Amino acid sequence: GYYDAYYNKANAVRRGITKDFTDAFTKCDVIVTPTTAGPAFKLGAKTSDPVAMYLEDIFTVSSNHTGMPAMSIPSGTVNEEGVQLPLGIQLIAPHMGEARLFVVGKKFLGEE
């Protein structure tokens, strides 16, 4: 039925994304993205627009779909209306690449 058709399509898309990421890791050690589309927003600020709220997490979706390890680390702040708001970057590694994430994350943070 409809459930099977959507489920099978979703799995095909997931496999395609996983293949693209796996191919990318033949050319790089980690993939770096923003953690969110913008700085942190006030609690409850986007509850009236769920799509806008979900789009803030758009960069973290790929690692969830591929099952590849990812970590977010602080990368600075930005001044929004007199308030310093945190920014972060996300590091994504290939399957079983958790140790690589810790090494790169520590280097970025100046801890190694």
Q: Language-model features: where?
A:
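Structural helix-boundary/capping segments
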Residues: 1-19, 27, 64-112
